[in-house]
Amino acid sequence: MSTLKIGICGWGNVATGLYKIAKKNIESIKKQGNLDIEIVVIGARRDNPNCKPENVIIERDIFNVVNHDIDVMVELIGGVDVAKDLILKALKKKKHVVTANKAVIYNHGDEIFACAKENGVKVLFESSVCAGTPIIKLLTEELSANKISKISGMLNGTSNFILSNMEDGAEFQSTLELAQKEGYAEPDPSFDIEGMDAAHKIGILSSLALG
């Protein structure tokens, strides 16, 4: 049985959620996929009280994560410039990269994918658009031989929640506060309500579908 060694960069809610799910499902993955998963190192500038990893190296300098013996780096720090530099460093060290960062793919996708190709590794970004819905795989594999002329859908959950409630008579501000309370919206919801989140997703999907 082969072992997939993973390094995680970032230690917020998404990263800790990934860690917990991976730990919980390790035996199932072994049985179904004939693959052992080992989280070797976590790049975390500070501790997260919601999750205390066990038997894992902690790097306070996230750029040191790719210096460890890992096969895959999972980038979950968010932002653009630092994330781009981190991803490029990992690719140049022949590490595969998984990211949920739509902003860095939207802004620097061409450079990132070119670097991955040059170094013979992959960049997987399914979760950057529509969370767990496999729209990226659908466009790049199942529908790759089809001519796509249009994509439509609900691309931003926060905006959809707010607009649906306003359609029923609710006020914008109170609905936004409810979305934040329920965890749909971030404490700073500007990317959602100003349309940047949806714009990044549209850019990624249109690039994949239309070239």
Regions found by a protein language model. Name each.
Residues Y19, K52-E54, G109-I112, P134-E141, ...:
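Short acidic, glycine/serine/threonine-rich loops at helix termini
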Residues M1-K93:
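N-terminal glycine-/serine-/threonine-rich beta1-alpha1-beta2 phosphate-ribose binding loop
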Residues C9, E75-I77, A100, N107, ...:
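Structural motif
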Residues G78-V80, S128, N156:
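Short glycine-rich anion-binding loops that position phosphate/pyrophosphate groups of nucleotides
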Residues H96-V98:
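A short hydrophobic/small-residue beta-strand
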Residues A145-G211:
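Active-site-lining helix/loop region of Rossmann-like oxidoreductase modules
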Residues C9, N13, G17, R60, ...:
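Conserved active-site and cofactor/substrate-binding residues in soluble primary-metabolism enzymes
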Residues K84-K93, K102-T140:
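Rossmann-fold NAD(P)-binding glycine/threonine-rich loop
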